[in-house]
Amino acid sequence: MATIHLLDDDTAVTNACAFLLESLGYDVKCWTQGADFLAQASLYQAGVVLLDMRMPVLDGQGVHDALRQCGSTLAVVFLTGHGDVPMAVEQMKRGAVDFLQKPVSVKPLQAALERALTVSSAAVARREIILCYQQLTPKERELASLVAKGFMNREIAEAMNIAVRTVEVHRARVMEKMQAGSLAELIRRFEKMASPETRIRTTYEP
């Protein structure tokens, strides 16, 4: 089950919000310090960070920057006071899914969480594909690119100046490493890896 990470230095807020989220059926973890969250939470799973904009030591923007830099698949929804709206909008430009003004009501919260969970699940799938892709050798990556473009084995052999049998061997390895059972699935995986719709905006790229 995806986890909702609730990060706010005000324990009264986290307790009240956690009670609400749990009553809606979500798995919730509460954090009061950004550094503790970054050190202890699983950052590469499907989930959402409900993130307070203003916190001591490491504020919401700092936590969001850290998540972007490490390529986390967690989606971020900011909780803001009225005066923080411009900052929250700026963070959305940097990849946050949404922002909600305090006090938060149920329907907007649930809608934002569902959008964020969809984004996070797609990011997890994309990250798994990227990890598979990173196992390919440079030659296998070149071959995979040609396969995805629809080149036949003989055309690949000519383009790469290798034997057709060598193409067949490399192609089989590419399919195995990319965990693709068919050419169509391999192409879909490359499309997912490249699609901005499956990407949480980060500094981590293949």
Swiss-Prot record:
<keyword id="KW-0805">Transcription regulation</keyword>
<keyword id="KW-0010">Activator</keyword>
<dbReference type="GO" id="GO:0005829">
    <property type="term" value="C:cytosol"/>
</dbReference>
<comment type="function">
    <text>Member of the two-component regulatory system TtrR/TtrS, which is required for synthesis of tetrathionate reductase. Positively regulates transcription of the ttrBCA operon. During mice infection, the ability to use tetrathionate as an electron acceptor is a growth advantage for S.typhimurium over the competing microbiota in the lumen of the inflamed gut.</text>
</comment>
<dbReference type="InterPro" id="IPR000792">
    <property type="entry name" value="Tscrpt_reg_LuxR_C"/>
</dbReference>
<dbReference type="GO" id="GO:0000156">
    <property type="term" value="F:phosphorelay response regulator activity"/>
</dbReference>
<keyword id="KW-0902">Two-component regulatory system</keyword>
<dbReference type="GO" id="GO:0000976">
    <property type="term" value="F:transcription cis-regulatory region binding"/>
</dbReference>
<keyword id="KW-0238">DNA-binding</keyword>
<dbReference type="Pfam" id="PF00072">
    <property type="entry name" value="Response_reg"/>
</dbReference>
<keyword id="KW-0963">Cytoplasm</keyword>
<dbReference type="InterPro" id="IPR001789">
    <property type="entry name" value="Sig_transdc_resp-reg_receiver"/>
</dbReference>
<feature type="domain" description="HTH luxR-type">
    <location>
        <begin position="134"/>
        <end position="194"/>
    </location>
</feature>
<feature type="DNA-binding region" description="H-T-H motif">
    <location>
        <begin position="153"/>
        <end position="172"/>
    </location>
</feature>
<dbReference type="GO" id="GO:0032993">
    <property type="term" value="C:protein-DNA complex"/>
</dbReference>
<keyword id="KW-0597">Phosphoprotein</keyword>
<protein>
    <recommendedName>
        <fullName>Tetrathionate response regulatory protein TtrR</fullName>
    </recommendedName>
</protein>
<feature type="domain" description="Response regulatory">
    <location>
        <begin position="3"/>
        <end position="117"/>
    </location>
</feature>
<dbReference type="InterPro" id="IPR011006">
    <property type="entry name" value="CheY-like_superfamily"/>
</dbReference>
<dbReference type="GO" id="GO:0006355">
    <property type="term" value="P:regulation of DNA-templated transcription"/>
</dbReference>
<dbReference type="InterPro" id="IPR053534">
    <property type="entry name" value="Tetrathionate_resp_reg"/>
</dbReference>
<feature type="modified residue" description="4-aspartylphosphate">
    <location>
        <position position="52"/>
    </location>
</feature>
<dbReference type="Pfam" id="PF00196">
    <property type="entry name" value="GerE"/>
</dbReference>
<dbReference type="InterPro" id="IPR036388">
    <property type="entry name" value="WH-like_DNA-bd_sf"/>
</dbReference>
<keyword id="KW-0804">Transcription</keyword>
